[in-house]
Amino acid sequence: MSAYIIETLIKILILVAVFSALGGFATYIERKVLAYFQRRLGPSYVGPFGLLQVAADGIKLFTKEDIIPQGANKLIFTLAPIIAMVSAFVSMAPIPFFPNFTLFGYEIKPIISDINIGFLFFLAVGAAGIYAPILAGLASNNKYSLIGSARATIQLLSFEVVSTLTILAPLMVVGSLSLVEINNYQSGGFLDWLVFKQPLAFILFLIASYAELNRTPFDLLEHEAEIVAGYCTEYSGLKWGMFFLAEYAHLFAFSFVISIVFFGGFNAWGFIPGGIAILIKVSFFVFLSMWVRATYPHVRPDQLMNMCWKIMLPLALLNIVLTGVIILI
């Protein structure tokens, strides 16, 4: 087995382990953030400051009975959470997480694969995760799960169109789909960040990412007040945990991509080294998603579709046209 294959396998194992741990810890942080906004304490009993709540929840999920409802399609019911996990982690393959560094005289590139269509790969593989809620709802033999899967089809496919069109304008400026090249394009300094050249694209992509991540206010797939837990209604134990671990892993992936594409990535930020700079940016966008969840109300399906097709899609197309005109001029 070649050194390249061994290195890649080690990177994959580290990526899965790190983001699985981060996903679990993010649940604790989110509960604390929501508690602060709602003037509650949040997790505070298990361990100091409730830090061991994540471990307690993990033990609970691993030891709960795995129930498959009567009349459900067992194969598809089991495959759905696996698809969610696989799509979330595979989509991270073209993301350069940190600058290259040297370890024991060997240069380490913190990226699985620097493919020249990295941004497109990220969106395409992430979009494949749409099948997870759809199949989960169809296989559960539950009306609430079925409604959740129908909403997943409408919501995720609609916003996938918007997010794909939105990235075209920044890519026209950079001239590459590689996330490494996009990062290098902004290496000149603070004013080279694409958020200043493409502010509309950033806003549209941020909103579309919340919709694709099924984050509030776009949590139509599993809104408790309407459809219990949506496509997850019949899931329990480890399978239920896999869905939410995939959601948080995807949240971190989108935060990295937004930081790389619009905010200079892992380039040095003044006196702040690149590795620390991207951690600050990613942490901000993860916190922002939690802040939005605590602040904005849930939207209705018709409001969501109107915003997507009548507002965001025309704005994305207009931004492409304006960017093309400016480049030609």
Swiss-Prot record:
It is a multi-pass membrane protein. The keyword Hydrolase does not apply. The keyword Transmembrane applies. Its main location: membrane. One of its GO terms (cellular component) is plasma membrane. Keywords: Cell inner membrane, Cell membrane, Membrane, NAD, Quinone, Translocase, Transmembrane, Transmembrane helix, Ubiquinone. Its EC number is 7.1.1.-. GO terms for molecular function: NADH dehydrogenase activity; oxidoreductase activity, acting on NAD(P)H, quinone or similar compound as acceptor; quinone binding. InterPro entries: NADH_UbQ_OxRdtase_su1/FPO, NADH_UbQ_OxRdtase_su1_CS. GO terms for biological process: aerobic respiration. It is found in: Cell inner membrane. The chain crosses the membrane at residues 9-29, 42-62, 75-95, 117-137, 154-174, 188-208, 238-258, 269-291, 309-329. It catalyses: a quinone + NADH + 5 H(+)(in) = a quinol + NAD(+) + 4 H(+)(out). It comes from the Bacteria. NCBIfam families: PRK06076.1-2. Belongs to the complex I subunit 1 family. NDH-1 shuttles electrons from NADH, via FMN and iron-sulfur (Fe-S) centers, to quinones in the respiratory chain. The immediate electron acceptor for the enzyme in this species is believed to be ubiquinone. Couples the redox reaction to proton translocation (for every two electrons transferred, four hydrogen ions are translocated across the cytoplasmic membrane), and thus conserves the redox energy in a proton gradient. This subunit may bind ubiquinone. NDH-1 is composed of 14 different subunits. Subunits NuoA, H, J, K, L, M, N constitute the membrane sector of the complex. This is NADH-quinone oxidoreductase subunit H. The lineage of its organism: Bacteria, Pseudomonadati, Campylobacterota, Epsilonproteobacteria, Campylobacterales. The gene is nuoH.
